[in-house]
Structures are given as C-alpha cells and as structure tokens.
Amino acid sequence: MAQEIEKEFLVKGDFKSEAFKATRITQGYLSSVPERTVRVRVKGDKGFITIKGIGNASGAARFEWEKEIPVEEVQQLLELAEPGVIDKTRYLVKNTDGKHTWEVDEFYGDNDGLTVAEVELADESEPFDKPEWLGEEVTGDPKYFNSMLMKNPYKNWK
C-alpha cells in the first residue's frame, strides 16, 4: 500500500489554457467513514476501486490502495453506493517547475461552481511553484473531501 502526499488548493483563476489533458470522472462511495473510504470510479473509459486510510495530522498524507476493475463492475457497485455521486472533469496542468503536475477538478451537479487543484509530493516539505490561478490552501479540510462533497455538496454551503 502506498502513501499519498498531496496539497490541495481552491482555484481562483483561469487554468484551462494550460491544461494538456481532460478526463471525465464519475464516482461514488461504498464507505465514507473518516477512518477509511472505499470509492468506485469511472475515469474516462476505465474503472477503479480505491481504499484510502485516515489522513495524518496535517491532512496531507494518507495510505491509498487502488486497483483497476471493469467499468461494468463499477456501474454495478455504484448501485450499492451511498447516496450521491460525484461528477467532475479532471484537468492535468504541468507545473512551471517542470517536476510536478497539477490535477484540477471542476465539479458539476450539486457541486457546480467548485474547482480545486492538488499536487502530489514526495514529502510534505517538498517545495513546488504555485501558479497564479491558485487560491486558498484547503489541504486537510474535510468539507473539500470528495466523500464529504457527496454528503454536503457545495450548493448547500451558500
């Protein structure tokens, strides 16, 4: 099982002109308890099941296990999922430092209007350039977890 270390930010400006790839994602949760989440996802034309552990104190690091599964199985598992589905497009944007790639998620449906960006790091103290379109850091803030957006979507925050 690998440890995932990410920093997450709100997006405040235009990033799409810098994106080199865009993929539609639909996902649901079989379990969304804080100690572990079990997610099923269709990403483009592939299916995945992912288990994530609880985050560390900063919220930047947690264990993650992911396996590709047939899209048909994801669709069947979505029938068993908790209420609510996350629908988004993930854009990939190369960072100006040449070492990192930003994953920028633009949400739809009940989370329309929310766009967040995350960068994966080798360790929490690793330096990285912050593009001009980045806003406030929200690393570790549970309300921005996809599993929480399913329960308390962005449209309800206003």
Regions from the PLM with identified roles:
Residues 1-158:
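Phosphate-end processing signature that detects enzymes handling 5′-triphosphorylated RNA
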